[in-house]
Amino acid sequence: MPSKLEGAMDALITVFHNYSGSEGDKYKLSKGELKELLNAELTDFLMSQKDPMLVEKIMNDLDSNKDNEVDFNEFVVLVAALTVACNDFFQEQQKKRSK
């Protein structure tokens, strides 16, 4: 049985490949595929944002090689950044509760 971390890694890989390749390179996400992934897999995150250009900004920030596609490495950077932001938020909430 895989560990929780191994399960999380498997989930990242599976989610990425469930959305990549329908519009071109099967190992990369196009802008449309990224938008579909974000809407389906990060619904709560997107609903809490007020910026209608958020997906465009995320794409521009992630697309480090400027090929208008997001590869798996670039995708993992997004997930890591969001995870850090969530962790920071929860730490702040914990600090407020303990005061």
UniProtKB/Swiss-Prot annotation:
Positions that bind Ca(2+) 2: D63, N65, D67, E69, E74
Q: What CDD domains does UniProt report for this protein, alphabetically?
A: S-100Z
Q: Which residues form the EF-hand domain?
A: 13-48, 50-85
InterPro entries, per database record: EF-hand-dom_pair, EF_Hand_1_Ca_BS, EF_hand_dom, S100/CaBP7/8-like_CS, S100_Ca-bd_sub, S100Z
- Write the record's keywords in alphabetical order, separated by commas: Calcium, Metal-binding, Repeat
> Which Pfam families does the UniProt entry name for this protein?
S_100
- Tissue distribution of the protein: In larva at 5 days post-fertilization, shows very restricted expression only in a few large cells of the olfactory placode. More widely expressed in the adult. Expressed at higher levels in gut than in spleen, head kidney and gill.
Q: Which residues bind Ca(2+) 1?
A: S20, E23, D25, K28, E33
Q: Give the matching SMART domains.
A: EFh, S_100
Induction cue: Induced by poly(I:C) in gut but not in spleen. Induced following infection with spring viremia of carp virus (SVCV). Down-regulated following infection with bacterial pathogen Edwardsiella tarda.
Molecular function, one GO term: calcium ion binding
What does the subunit section of this Swiss-Prot or TrEMBL entry state? Homodimer. Homodimers may assemble into larger stable oligomers.
State the protein's name.
Protein S100-Z
This chain's source organism reads: Danio rerio
For this protein's source organism, the top of the classification is: Eukaryota, Metazoa, Chordata, Craniata, Vertebrata
